[in-house]
């Protein structure tokens, strides 16, 4: 058994702490917020999207990005910048848009997602967590025939990875999401992913925090991390505003903020804060609300059903750590919600939110060892932190405890990036 410090209490940090504790370690979580999941995990899309696990870096994206720059409601926005970190990250992302790399990255992501599904299933079977979860799948809807044609390559990868799916016509889409009936003329079909789930990530995190406390995990909230202190290639402590915290091993699970903490150690990981937005609406008419998750392929916006709320989330914006919520981004999210489910939610009571998704240029998270003997990472999950959290945490616990995991062959640690090591 080792004493382990987990830095970060988002869904990835909390699940890391949980699985490390289950492996027999003495775990402490450190975070600057007053409780867990107060940042990127707070109001995300609510999707647990095993079948939708796919990198943003895909064939055709460079051409689409140029077109999106001229569109009012584009799914990708890039704020002009000469930031070297952004330019480097974008260059790496463009390289990963090649078909061969896309296929490798997507298959890797699907493997993590499928493993995570089994981990979350086992957790729920034991503890019956109540986070307004539903197991009714994801319906990816298409507005034009080109999208239907383009999805065929993804379907091949899904089949190879053992992910269940079904290509649907519009009438079949309505059997899963009858609330789309008033706008069915806007659709040409959909892809049904029956094994996907939904749930409020924030509620999950609060319940997991309490479970972890019962298992002996300690939490230092309102504690600001300043730097990692090392001797040679070993970490000897974490300097915080409350003093130096020491352990046998350290896990960096700080999302987009992992990069700045690791850089002084000579570790440069290509994780960039890709800004996302959400809108949460009270449901006013259940028959016109989504039943699970509807993913609008055109705008890359997800509409997810909680018990009495609709969570609308989307947009990828490259703008650094700017916390502002521009009116234009609000307009895009609200437009899609009104376009597909105009009578389902109370738009007058909608609440907007933004968060910084920690995204790698290849879409795959960075899980595992580092050049420092007792330092580990679990970060870079992008839009799929909720989807991959349990599986990633289990992989991390295996690597920290045994030196490897069943998925080590995928090359998930930072050593896949030459400059990082």
Swiss-Prot record:
Q: InterPro entries per the record?
A: DadA, FAD-dep_OxRdtase, FAD/NAD-bd_sf
Which terms under GO biological process does the entry name?
D-alanine catabolic process
A GO MF annotation of the entry reads: D-amino-acid dehydrogenase activity
Q: Which cofactor does it need?
A: FAD
Q: Which keywords annotate this record?
A: FAD, Flavoprotein, Oxidoreductase
Question: GO CC terms for this protein?
Answer: cytoplasm; plasma membrane
**Entry similarity comment:** Belongs to the DadA oxidoreductase family.
**Alphabetical list of PANTHER family matching this protein:** D-AMINO ACID DEHYDROGENASE, SARCOSINE DEHYDROGENASE-RELATED
Task: State the protein's purpose.
Answer: Oxidative deamination of D-amino acids.
Protein name listed in UniProt: D-amino acid dehydrogenase
Organism of origin: Vibrio cholerae serotype O1 (strain M66-2)
Gene name of the record: dadA
């Amino acid at each position: 058994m080792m004493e382990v410090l987990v830095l970060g209490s988002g869904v990835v940090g909390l699940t890391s702490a949980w699985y490390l504790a289950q492996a027999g370690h003495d775990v402490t979580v450190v975070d600057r917020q007053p409780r867990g999941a107060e940042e990127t995990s707070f109001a995300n899309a609510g999707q647990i999207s095993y079948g939708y696990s796919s990198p943003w870096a895909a064939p055709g994206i460079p051409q689409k990005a140029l077109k999106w720059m001229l569109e009012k409601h584009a799914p990708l926005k890039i704020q002009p910048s000469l930031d070297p970190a952004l330019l480097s990250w974008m260059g790496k992302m463009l390289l990963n848009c090649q078909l061969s790399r896309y296929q490798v990255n997507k298959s890797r992501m699907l493997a993590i997602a499928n493993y995570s599904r089994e981990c979350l299933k086992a957790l729920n079977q034991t503890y019956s967590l109540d986070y307004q979860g539903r197991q009714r799948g994801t319906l990816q809807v298409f507005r034009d025939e080109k999208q239907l044609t383009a999805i065929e390559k993804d379907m091949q990868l899904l089949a190879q990875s053992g992910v269940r799916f079904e290509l649907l016509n519009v009438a079949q889409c309505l059997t899963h999401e009858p609330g789309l009936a008033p706008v069915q003329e806007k659709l040409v079909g959909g892809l049904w992913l029956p094994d996907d789930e939904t749930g409020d990530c924030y509620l999950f995190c609060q319940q997991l925090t309490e479970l972890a406390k019962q298992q002996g995990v300690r939490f230092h909230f309102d504690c600001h991390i300043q730097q990692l202190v090392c001797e040679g290639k070993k970490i000897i402590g974490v300097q915080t505003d409350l003093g130096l915290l020491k352990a046998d091993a350290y896990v960096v699970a700080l999302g987009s903020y992992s990069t700045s903490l690791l850089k002084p150690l000579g570790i440069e990981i290509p994780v960039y804060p890709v800004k996302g937005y959400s809108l949460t609406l009270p449901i006013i008419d259940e028959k016109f609300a989504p039943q699970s998750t509807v993913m609008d392929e055109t705008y890359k916006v997800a509409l997810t059903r909680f018990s009495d709320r609709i969570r609308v989330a989307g947009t990828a914006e490259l703008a650094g750590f700017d916390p502002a919520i521009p009116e234009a981004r609000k307009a895009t999210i609200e437009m899609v919600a009104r376009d597909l489910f105009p009578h389902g939610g109370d738009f007058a009571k909608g609440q907007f939110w933004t968060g910084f998704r920690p995204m790698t240029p290849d879409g795959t998270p960075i899980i595992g060892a580092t050049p420092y003997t007792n330092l580990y990472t679990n970060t870079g999950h992008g839009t799929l932190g909720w989807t991959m959290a349990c599986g990633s945490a289990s992989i991390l616990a295996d690597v920290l405890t045994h030196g490897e995991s069943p998925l080590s062959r995928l090359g998930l640690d930072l050593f896949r990036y030459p400059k990082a090591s």
